[in-house]
Amino acid sequence: MRFNPGYRIKVGQREFSVTGRISYRGNDGSVWDEYSLRDSSGRTAWLSVDDEEGEYILSEATGLQHPPEGFSLYWQGSERVTGVSGRVDVEPGDEAVCSDYEDHSGRIYSVERWDDETEYSLGTILDPDKIIRISGGGVAGWMQN
């Protein structure tokens, strides 16, 4: 599943414009893409797509700086940006240390520690059939290392 900036997609009942794409490689060799999304009210969300593992997560920034009660650590490691397109605030070669937590209902809490900031997000694991491309759009330049 791959989208380009300018595409319109539907995730569950929400419609979004894809504004950017970041490709990552984890220190364990895993690869995945994250898409920056904007809904009609201007809110930003992120769609993480790992086709290899069959994992799809829609998340949004949160002010919570610690995992909520009932969440358990399920992945910890580092990620390296391998490619970008559209409007994103990272470059190929940037790295972060990450911790992902999950609760029994499939909610995800993530922490990404970059050189210049720490980001916290809450999300939900999705079935891939809940992610639908509505229309294609322009293709922004792709940068990778």
State the predicted function of each range:
Residues 1-145:
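Mixed-charge, low-complexity intrinsically disordered regions
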